[in-house]
Amino acid sequence: MLCRRFLPPSASRHIAALVCGAGVSWPDVRLAPRRVLVGSSISIALVPHLGEGDQAVLFATRFGEEPEVVNWLETAAPHHYDIVLEIGANNGFFSVFLDALIRSMPSAKLRSVVSFEPSLEAFQRLLANLAANDAVHVSPFRAAVGTAAGFQAFFMPRGHLANGSLLRSFAAQCADEIDEQTVAVIDAASLEYFFTGIDRALLKIDAEGYEPQILQSLDPLIERHRPDIVIEVLAATAQAIEDFAARAGYRRFLLTPAGPQTRERVSADRDFRDWLLCAARTGEV
């Protein structure tokens, strides 16, 4: 509590490194949710886990996860979109943030968030974070989105909860030991349900190397509904995502702390991974 309320950020980070840094091992301890500020000052609660990214909420009252994405979502999502579909929601950080945004803006256009996460452990954390926030605008589903509906192997690099993937080759880059789960997979046809009566939708895709396959699966849906897309771009996926953007006629913007930056092509960036792909239409980004 001292770290969170009274110490400067540099001192809090130093204490966090001493308590939870590399080489420090803790037993699995259930901790209570901590309330933190994100974006301009949106308050959310997150359940911390020692040794993982969300442990930061133990040591500070502000949580700085992917600020370039948070800032853009806070500015654009409530006013431009009816629904956000989050594919690869992990522990639900963005889902609870979007829910808090909706509740803070009763007149917002955005009214619904749909979250997909295949990993059992990550999905349990997503549910815990939704409960900690009394979230009412989020519909969570334990499922992956892929090229065909059915069941598929999902690969979890041990000790790297955020890097689970439908691609074993991707998971193997993160850890030597890989745990395998069988998960439900839905395809684009299943997502049509969420577009009924929708004027404008946003897809947020973070699938640890599987993004090109998801875009391929969603191609007919994207052609019909023209959603905007926030997507993680890595060196191995950049060309396939650029090919999609060119074929679909989408504008490309790299999300940065200074806002979306127009780019001619999608490419892997040294500092920022998330891109905004916008359907050709008039209006603000």
Where are these regions (language model features)?
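S-adenosyl-L-methionine
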Residues: 1-119, 124-197, ...
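Conserved S-adenosyl-L-methionine
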Residues: 141-143, 250-259
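Short beta->alpha connector loops
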Residues: 120, 209-210, 234-237, 258-259
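Short, surface-exposed amphipathic charged segments that create phosphate/polyanion-binding patches used
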Residues: 152-159, 265-273
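Short internal beta-strands
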Residues: 114-117, 227-233
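Hydrophobic pocket-lining residues within nucleotide cofactor-binding pockets
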Residues: 89, 118, 145-147, 188, ...
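Short internal loop-to-helix segment that lines adenine-nucleotide cofactor pockets
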Residues: 60-85, 153, 167-225, 236-240, ...
